[in-house]
Amino acid sequence: MDVTGIDAAKAGWVAVSIKDGQFSWTVASSLDEIECGTRTYIDMPVGLEENKRRSVDRLLREELKPGRTSCVFNAPLRTALEQPDYHTANDYSKQHAGFGLSKQAWYLLPKIEQVRTHYQPGWVESHPEVCFARLTGHPARHSKRTVEGVAERIALLQRYACPAYWELNVRGVATDDWIDACLLAIAATLPAVYVPADCPVDITGFPLYAALPKKITFTETV
C-alpha cells in the first residue's frame, strides 16, 4: 500500500510518502498539489461537531496522559468556518457548546477548510504525538521543539529507515514539520485502529475519528 503523511507548515503543507518501501517528499502551498497515497494520514481536524466537543479530541488526549495532553487542542465547531472574526466565533462556541475557541484553533480554520474542500477517500485525521506514543509505548518525554525532543523522535524514525528530511533547508518548513509528516507516513504503513471505534461522521459526512497505529508491545520489534 502506498501511504502519505501530511502536516501543516508555514509554506502550506509538507507531505512524506512511502511507496514500495521508498520514501519521497513534497512541499506545496495547497493540498490539491500533493499526490497522496491510497491511505493518507493528516494532522488536522477533518470532521467538526455542531454544538459539542469532539469525542476524538478527548480520546487522543487520553493517549498522551499524564504530561502531553496539551498537544491536542479542541477542534472548532463547524459553524466557526462561517464566522466573520475570532470574537464572534468564540462567543458562539461558548453559547452553543459550552467551551471557548482557542486562538490556535481559529488560526487553523483556513487549513481545516482546505482539508474539507480537497478531501479525498482514504484521507483520515491522525496525530503524530499519539502515533509516537503508540510506537514507543509512552508519550514523548520532551517537546518536539527542543533539542531533546527532536532527538527522541528522530531515534524512532531511524528505526524505520526514514531519510533525514529534517536536515533539509526548505523555506517555510520547520524541523518538527518534517518529523510530524514522517511519523504520520510511517504510522500509515502499519495496521490501524480508529478512535472512536465506531467511526462517526459529522453532519456533512466528514470523518469525526482519527486513525492510529496499533500499539506495539515491549516484545515486538520494528
PLM features: residue spans?
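Phosphate- and other anionic-substrate recognition elements at nucleic-acid/protein interfaces
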Residues: 1-4, 8-222
